[in-house]
From Swiss-Prot:
It is an enzyme of class 7 (translocase). GO terms for molecular function: NADH dehydrogenase (ubiquinone) activity; NADH:ubiquinone reductase (non-electrogenic) activity; quinone binding. It is a multi-pass membrane protein. Keywords: Cell inner membrane, Cell membrane, Membrane, NAD, Quinone, Translocase, Transmembrane, Transmembrane helix, Transport. Signal peptide: none annotated. It comes from Thermus thermophilus (strain ATCC 27634 / DSM 579 / HB8). This is NADH-quinone oxidoreductase subunit 7. The lineage of its organism: Bacteria, Thermotogati, Deinococcota, Deinococci, Thermales.
Length: 119
């Protein structure tokens, strides 16, 4: 079997998914109501009128959330190795070691740039 024939089903699936997503966006943009107003430009406050001045959300919370996601994904990638560590041998260990070292270097760079400092 030719290599491309093995992926025809996947390519069709991705193509249909992209088509449906783009079609939904286009239909919403073309048929949706376009009534900009002052109320739509105000920040959402759980259905209540905004009280007081609007304050910017500190970016540091966003950075902490991104770091959490980064290391959460790391654990998700390391989980299969932890389950089958005995069967992977030296090459599996070296692959996981390289992956962990790469993430550790990224963590050190973030630390060096001061991302972890709370101002």
């Amino acid at each position: 079997m030719a290599p491309i024939q093995e992926y025809v089903g996947t390519l069709i699936y991705v193509g249909v998914a992209l088509f449906i997503g783009v079609a939904a966006l286009l239909v919403g943009a073309l048929l949706g109501p376009k009534k900009p107003g002052r109320a739509k430009l105000m920040p959402y406050e759980s259905g209540n009128d905004p009280a007081g001045e609007v304050k910017r959300f500190p970016v540091h919370f966003y950075v902490v959330a991104m770091l959490f996601i980064l290391f959460d994904v790391e654990v998700a990638f390391l989980w299969p190795y932890a389950v089958s560590a005995g069967g992977l041998g030296l090459y599996g260990f070296l692959g996981v070691l390289a992956f962990t070292l790469l993430l550790f270097v990224g963590f050190l760079y973030e630390w060096w740039k001061g991302v972890m400092r709370w101002h």
